[in-house]
Amino acid sequence: MFEQIVEWIKQNYGDARKIIEIGVGHRIDVAEQISKALPRTEVLVTDTNESLVRSREIGRVRAVTDDVMFPTLNLYEGASLIYSLHPPGEIVQALEKLANRIGADLLVVPISDERHDLPQERWRELVVRGRILGWLLNKRV
């Protein structure tokens, strides 16, 4: 599934200056794949766990400690896409608020088919090859 997300991001954000993953946790491989697929794009990952962020040997991907509930806005400025893989439901509203503030699209990839009560008038399913990969709040795509 994550390979399909990387391919979709490559196809739809090939001209992006910056793409950000929020709540990277232990899974850095998706950001690394995006960085390889889009070598001219800055790929940034954030997490609230400072020791986890400091432990990253991640090549071109930059890792920063930040909390989406109280974001450091200048980190996110210029991003075309913010995405989060399997975020806890309680941060989805903060993700949406941040994306709206900086004018970025937001992709939320929940665990299985969970929707976190996303308002249908603003969010749409991201379907690739007949499979729902996530939920998109977008300005561009």
Regions found by a protein language model. Name each.
Residues M1-R17:
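S-adenosyl-L-methionine
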Residues D15-R27:
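Conserved class I S-adenosyl-L-methionine
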Residues H26-R40:
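Conserved SAM-binding loop of SAM-dependent methyltransferases across substrates and taxa
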Residues L44-T46, E114-V141:
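Active-site capping/gating segments
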Residues I58-F70:
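Conserved SAM-binding strand-loop segment of SAM-dependent methyltransferases
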Residues F70-E77:
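Short conserved loop adjoining the S-adenosyl-L-methionine
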Residues A79-Q93:
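A short SAM/SAH-binding and catalytic strip from SAM-dependent methyltransferases
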Residues G103-D117:
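Conserved beta-strand signature within the Rossmann-like core of class I S-adenosyl-L-methionine
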